Amino acid sequence: VTFVPPGVLDAARALASGEALRALGLVGRVESALGLTLRGIAYAQLGDLEQARAALEQAVGITRDPRTRARARAALVEIALSTGEPAPAARAAKASASDLERLGDARNAAMQRLVLARAEVLLGRLSEARRVVDEVLAADLAPDLRAVASLAQAEIAVRSVSASAARAALARARSCLAEVPNQLLARALVALEQELSRPIARTLRKGIIRDVDLFAVEEVSRGEVLLVDACRRLAIGGRVTIPLAKRSVLFALLFELARGWPGSVARDELAARAFDVRKVNASHRSRLRVEIGRLRKVMDGLAAEPVATADGYVLESKRDVVVLLPPTDDEAARISILLGDGATWSAQGLAEHAGVSKSTAQRALAALVRSGGAVRTGKGKDVRYTRPGTPIASRMLLLGLVPKP
């Protein structure tokens, strides 16, 4: 039986309950592989990823114990993910989970699969992330690990605009944490609960604008109304979704008609806004007729269409018409809400969906990265942006790191 100093055992228990500062105080000077691994995890939980990486790499270099080495490498995988390298981190997480499983460490293998799920979220593959988390939850898990997985479920649901599913997952996580209190997970739980309740957008309905939370966005996205989504530039009615991000003129026409609903919009006013001109002439009016015809064709299946009136056009719809707007009118707010879907975006893609120029999108993204509202990954043509979100693998708890005394 390997002797483990009491201080190291206490540090492992402190990390297991989310007390990183206490753990760091206990192993800050311990130079064994196990001590260095615990120190690295403590640094990571506190956000000092450089010191965390250094300690963990040192542990990998000096240990002869396969399980300690595998656990230190597992922690390094999550550091790679935290520093914006989701694609290589996903590959490393799969390999790490297999290694831990082979060494009989099913608990930390499950944690690595949750790291993999986090990587899939950052890569924009929400369905794959959901599948991985569901597989983890299908096993017989301890309450603390089940709490981590339930938090993962909640974040994926938030990014999928499924507020009800997110609330149910958070309730399961809270129930687990009632059995095994953990400061780190409790903070993640509160952060996600706050995200569910805060206003994230606005709705415009019959001239009335209201701030709405994720539950309200979920409600209007179910297809019971005709939703004209100015955040993602699409229209939803019934089971039909029409993407219009790359058809800016058609979306501009639909947006203006939806904004004026149930009234009509004058021809010259509609043309000026859709074509972004100050003075409308005969050629603009002719083009307007053509574009309205195209819009009518695109809207087939939505139970709504633009119809000519004496002085303009009106949107006739069998459902109430609701416009979904960003929380504010600035470009950063529009781009931020697009990032919330979990996908990784190029600046060009965000510009197209937000209806702004690429340079405007780049300025807004730079401001979001500086403020922590966005994460930038890749280089050159491969630069992508996503929302940071809650670390769904819980920043390397790696519970059960040392043998029981």
Question: Predicted segment positions?
Answer:
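Amphipathic alpha-helical segments of tetratricopeptide repeats
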Residues: 24, 31, 57-61, 94-105, ...
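Short boundary/linker motifs that mark transitions into or out of structured domains
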Residues: 186-251, 255, 297, 302-331
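Short amphipathic alpha-helical recognition elements used for nucleic-acid or partner binding
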Residues: 240-275, 295, 331-335, 341
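Short, cationic-aromatic polyanion-contact patches
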Residues: 314-329, 379-401
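DNA-binding patch around the recognition helix
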Residues: 281, 288-323, 366-382
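Residue register of alpha-helical TPR repeats
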Residues: 5, 34, 41, 71, ...
